[in-house]
Amino acid sequence: MQGELFIVSTPIGNLDDITLRAIQTLQNIDFILAEDTRVAKKLLKHLGIKANLQSLNEHNELKKIPIVLKHLLEGKNIALISDAGTPLISDPGFQLVKQAKKEALRVIPIPGCSAAIAALSVSGIPTDRFYFYGFLPKTKNKRLDVLKKLVKKEETIIVYESVHRLSSSINDMIEVFGKKHIAVLCKEITKLHEELIGINLEEIRVFLMENPSKIKGEFTVILNGKKSSEINNTEKIDSILKELLPIVSVKVAVKICSISTGYNKNKIYKRALELKI
């Protein structure tokens, strides 16, 4: 009989958020694949579970897959956990699951915590439709390219960011979305010093500038989606500018476009320069 691969969600901060089913699964498994065995040991010690731990992370996943599949095909039951939250969600494991499915092996979800969903649920920003991006790119140019695509979305946007790039990313968001754009920064969700910051991007920027000692760990940023009317207006601006720029100066094109749409001249000028390049 073939073994089963369990995708086990773990707490994102408060260890007591572990589910009973997750505990039962980890207690009755042949071995556990952990993103970081040191982090996993702390959780297992808290739960009083002794288990055979092996690492599976972004650096060794492809190398480990054949070995793991062999164990599964031999009848071993295996659990995959990440450092926190649901495995595969901005964490390793996708390639393993993909290959397990190809081998017709059973992959079983053991649901639980997710920082993205926890943050969204308390953000006060619409939850009916949302777009999860994950971690933004490390370099400014690539990050701006992504943000320029995200700003067009009507859905609520969820992104993760690390402590080292948080301030830079917020500044980039202000550049693309505008400082008054509705947004909430969620830090240390489910932990003792859990905090939700800001009503807009400018408030978040000011908080980070005034509280450098609080910039620790990983963060979730929830951004309000763009209204349909704004998207339609942007498309109209692009259409007008694309017709005018080949035949008149930027200044004249901006003036005509502003009169036609009633839109802010500065924003139209910025867009005109982007189209002109």
Regions found by a protein language model. Name each.
Residues M1-H59:
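Glycine-rich, flexible N-terminal cofactor/catalytic loop recognition
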Residues L26-I32, L105-I108, T156-I157:
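Short active-site oxyanion
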